[in-house]
């Protein structure tokens, strides 16, 4: 049985040097909200709460976590790492319905789920990827994201200089512009 003894939450906020333009808006900040759950063995499990957009989504989710989740997580116990997800997802159904905010609550529950699985794997002394799939690779590929269409060549060059070989650019504005951007990258 895993007993959660301590909770820490970290809100990171980074001002973008160049705002990221996407089909759903302009991102001037990048936020990351990380939950750390510490158990009776002093193991830490980490989970990230999705809060990429809008700009202040991280602070909003931080406040929801403090107001609704933190006290429930204190002294929370679980044996199966799937149990916390089910418990917290169901626990806030009425609030999600009343507020109409399914997204933020679900994002937080997902972050808790990741932290619980991480904690479970550490108690089993098994890397999480191997716990979930013993045949999973030891290394994963990464990609560069947040690349605006009008500066994709410069950003892709920067990423390549860091050893990154895969890229994700923003599309979804105008079909002809999107095709033109993708064709220029293909030639690039």
Where are these regions (language model features)?
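Metal-dependent enolase-superfamily TIM-barrel catalytic cores that perform enediolate-based chemistry
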Residues: 130-188
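N-terminal amphipathic alpha-helix/helix-capping segment at the start of soluble metabolic enzymes
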Residues: 1-10, 122, 126-140
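A short alpha-helix capping/helix-coil boundary motif
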Residues: 13, 94-98, 133-137
């Amino acid at each position: 049985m895993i007993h959660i003894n301590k909770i820490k939450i970290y809100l990171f906020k980074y001002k973008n040097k160049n705002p990221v333009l996407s089909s759903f808006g302009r991102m001037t900040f990048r936020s990351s909200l990380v939950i750390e759950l510490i158990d009776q063995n002093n193991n830490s499990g980490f989970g990230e709460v999705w809060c990429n957009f809008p700009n202040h989504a991280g602070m909003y989710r931080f406040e929801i976590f403090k107001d609704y989740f933190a006290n429930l997580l204190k002294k929370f116990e679980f044996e199966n790492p799937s149990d916390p997800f089910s418990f917290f997802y169901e626990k806030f159904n009425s609030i999600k319905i009343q507020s109409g905010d399914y997204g933020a609550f679900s994002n937080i529950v997902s972050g808790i789920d990741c932290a619980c699985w991480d904690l479970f794997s550490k108690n089993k002394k098994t890397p999480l990827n191997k716990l979930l799939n013993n045949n999973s690779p030891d290394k994963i590929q990464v990609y560069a994201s947040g690349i605006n269409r009008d500066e994709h060549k410069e950003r892709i060059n920067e990423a390549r200089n860091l050893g990154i070989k895969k890229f994700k650019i923003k599309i979804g504005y105008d079909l002809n512009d999107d095709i033109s951007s993708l064709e220029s990258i293909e030639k690039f």
